[in-house]
Structure formats: C-alpha cells, structure tokens
C-alpha cells in the first residue's frame, strides 16, 4: 500500500531550506507494509516548526547553568528516593548519539536497534547509520535521551531526571519521516523484549486517523508486561485546536502535553481528553550529538521529562503495574482544579511528590478528583455594627475605670513618697545643725 502524507519535520542541525523554515512541512511518501493498517498514517517528530531557530546546531557548547525545568525540582530530595538505577528506558526516535559524554555511559548499545529501511519509497538510499541505533544525524533522539538519563558532568548543571537509568536506543524515524506505523510497532516490541521498563515515544501521527491495529497490539503487548508507555501529545494546539493523536491516545498510554514556566499549557501544546499530564516543554535544555547542549521546544521534550519520573518510580516500586505508575504520576501532579482538564490533563507533573506522596502497599489505580487541589474555605466575616454596641461600651467604660483607678493609686503613692522624702530631708538638716553648735 502506498501512502502519501505530510510530515511535520522536527529540528535538524539548524540548517533547513527556506520553504521548510517557513512552513515546517515537507511532502513525503510512506510505504506501509502492514496488511493490518487500513488507514493512511504518517509519523512525525513532535517539535514545533518554529522551535528550530539555529540554536540546535551540533556539536555545541556546554550549558553552564541549571535549566529552569530542573530548578523547579528539589533534585537532592528526589534522588534520595530513587535515581532510576536498574531501569531501562527505550527511546524510540532518530537514534541516540553516544559520543556526547553525558550519554556515553547511559546508553546500552547492545540492546539498541536500527529499524530504518535501506531505501525510502522513492528508491533513494537512506543514511541509516549503524545497526545499534547510536547514530543520530537529526539530534532529536539525543535530546530526548538526555532529558531522561544524562549523567552528571563538570561544567554544566544539566542532568537527566533519572541519572542512573539506562537508555535503549531504537532508531525508527528520521527527519524525512521514513518511519512507519509498522516499524513503530516493531520498535515497541523490541523494547519490551530487551527488558525496557519504560518506553518513550516523542512522535505522533501527522493527521487525525483511526488507530492502527498493529500499533495498538504492540502497545497492549507492552502494557501487559508492566511496561510504562509515555508519548508526546503533539504540537497542533495553536488556536485551541483539538486533535486526537496516536500512539498518545491509546488506552493505557500516558499522553504528555507541554507546560511553560508558569505551569500553564504551552501555546503549541495539543489539547484533548486523552492528555494525561503536562510537563515542561519550553526552552528545554538537553544533550546534542557530539557534545554540548541546545535549547528546544515541544511536547517531544515534555514526554521524556515524565518518562524520567516513571523510571524513578519503576526503580523504587518494581512490583507496580504500568497503570499504577501512570496513576501515581497523574494523582500527584500540580493542578489548579480538582479534576482533569483537556489542556494539561491532571496537571503539571511534580517529580518529588510523585515519589514521596505514596502508599507503597496501596498504590493508586486511577487518579481521583478529590486528591487534587483542595477547595478554599469561605472566609469568616465579622458582624458589621454601625456605632458602638452595648458590650463594646461596657468594655470601654470598664477600661476607663481601671485605668483611672490606676492613675489615682499611682498619684497617691507618689504623694506619699514625696511627703516621706521631704520629712527625711528636714530631719537631716535639723540634725546637722545641732552637731555643729
């Protein structure tokens, strides 16, 4: 089956053609080999077209400070609970470059896979890179992986939320959209079979389409094995647009919207009832191929923020199901209303609260509205009196009597002391005169 669609390209190396820079769109032809896929489906990296402003050239310089998305978290308190050690997180993306020093020891290349075909549907040779998925000519997957599990390094305050988790690199897509629903489904199954506890998918369908059976079955395969599947909600939210995207909309998948520095939905972030939570997705610092960092925007970088939290929970509570981990993240999210809304889901993820506000023996199965923001109590208003009440008058007069009495007593006491002192002085004068005669 031959499918023609529109691909919203993600950020590349900072050099895109004039048309691409203006529109962020490129026409692509996708060959889908699955007989089970009955509808057109194209996949896209979930990064706004306007996000690529030239900052994401690579290799790059180090970002010296602590990014705002990490400043909002007490990392010492968070990592006292869990660092993600022992948990594998699959990054299904454009590959993960292990030459960046913060990712070299974070990536398990032996478990990686490259699912891009040798040639595209036009018969043109694709620059696939190695078979382990550890080459990334786009830079997208490398940034995603860094947000999850980048190791601490001198000269930068950037680090992954789960700095001891292990990344499984799966190269399944590229800047031209050569990934398909079939290869995405294969990637999910590969991740599960290689022992992933969490899967991050920062891509979605470019157009609203019906679910694909092969993709749905792959997601179900992961969930049945307690694997948490996190997916970006998409970046078609400008103007309040609501568009259902996959795999984010599948039952059991934690769909992540993007929030800004004010814990509000980022303007581009996709809205919908399928949104589970939101996470920082504006001015997101992360690793790039080779070395260094860059800043980017998009739900592509909100999803790995949540995947990192999921890895922390998975390491601390390995017996929990995927549903319980997702529910815990949703239940403990920061929100301004008691329930769910289609902009930020159950709220903006709170990593520390997700790890500390928990009953290990009774994990949350589904988020509850009453567990969100408590409603404020009505203020207690004092009675309004025009003029002085009888009680107030009695209190005032009583005060006057007491104060007046104290003044009189003090005056009398003072007079007595004065008389006494005067008598003593006269006595001393008289006594002094007799002695001298």
Q: What is each residue range found by the language model?
A:
Residues 172-246, 292-297:
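Substrate-binding/access-modulating region of protease and related hydrolase catalytic domains
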Residues 93, 157-175, 199, 321-333:
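Short helix-loop-beta-strand segments that form the rim/entrance of peptidase-like active sites
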Residues 116-126, 258-300:
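Catalytic-core environment of secreted peptidases
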Residues 1-52, 401-421:
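Secretory targeting and sorting signals
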Residues 318-412, 432-435:
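C-terminal subdomain of the subtilisin-like protease fold in secreted/lumenal serine endopeptidases
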Residues 147-148, 281-349:
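Hydrolase catalytic cores
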Residues 53-164, 193:
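Active-site core segment of subtilase-fold serine proteases
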Residues 424-437:
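Cytoplasmic C-terminal tails of single-pass
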């Amino acid at each position: 089956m031959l499918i023609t669609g529109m691909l919203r390209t993600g950020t590349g190396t900072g050099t895109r053609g004039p048309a691409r820079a203006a529109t962020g769109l490129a026409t692509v032809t996708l060959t889908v080999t699955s007989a089970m896929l009955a509808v057109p489906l194209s996949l896209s990296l979930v990064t706004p077209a306007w996000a690529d402003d030239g900052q994401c050239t690579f290799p790059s310089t180090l970002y010296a400070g602590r990014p705002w998305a990490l400043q909002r978290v007490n990392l010492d308190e968070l990592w006292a609970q869990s660092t993600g050690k022992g948990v594998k997180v699959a990054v299904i993306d454009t590959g993960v470059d292990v030459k960046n020093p913060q990712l070299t020891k974070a990536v398990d290349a032996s478990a990686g896979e490259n699912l891009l075909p040798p040639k595209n549907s036009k018969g043109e040779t694709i620059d696939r890179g190695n078979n382990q998925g550890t080459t990334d000519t786009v830079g997208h997957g490398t940034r995603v992986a860094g947000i999850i599990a980048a190791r601490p390094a001198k000269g930068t305050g950037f680090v992954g939320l789960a700095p001891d988790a292990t990344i499984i690199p799966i190269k399944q897509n590229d800047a031209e959209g050569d990934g398909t629903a079939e290869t995405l489904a294969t990637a999910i199954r590969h991740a599960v079979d290689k022992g992933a506890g969490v899967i991050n998918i920062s891509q979605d369908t470019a157009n609203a389409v019906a679910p694909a059976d092969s993709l749905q079955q792959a997601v179900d395969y992961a969930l049945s094995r307690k694997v948490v599947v996190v997916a970006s909600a998409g970046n078609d939210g400008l103007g309040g647009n609501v568009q259902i995207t996959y795999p984010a909309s599948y039952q059991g998948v934690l769909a992540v919207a993007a929030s800004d520095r004010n814990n509000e939905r980022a303007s581009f972030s996709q809205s919908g009832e399928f949104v589970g939570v939101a996470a920082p997705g504006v001015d997101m610092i992360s690793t790039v191929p080779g070395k260094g960092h860059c800043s980017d925007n998009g739900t592509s970088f909100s999803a790995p923020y949540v995947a990192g939290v999921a890895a922390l929970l998975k390491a601390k509570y390995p017996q929990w199901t995927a549903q319980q981990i997702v529910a815990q993240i949703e239940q403990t999210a920061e929100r301004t209303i008691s329930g769910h809304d289609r902009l930020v889901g159950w709220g903006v993820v709170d990593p520390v609260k997700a790890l500390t506000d928990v009953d290990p023996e009774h994990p949350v199965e589904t988020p509850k509205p009453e567990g969100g923001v408590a409603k404020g109590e009505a203020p207690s208003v004092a009675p309004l009196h025009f003029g002085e009440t009888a009680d107030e008058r009695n209190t005032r007069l009583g005060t006057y009597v007491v104060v007046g009495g104290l003044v009189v007593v003090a005056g009398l006491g003072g007079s007595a002391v004065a008389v006494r002192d005067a008598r003593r002085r006269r006595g001393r004068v008289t006594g002094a005169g007799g002695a001298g005669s």
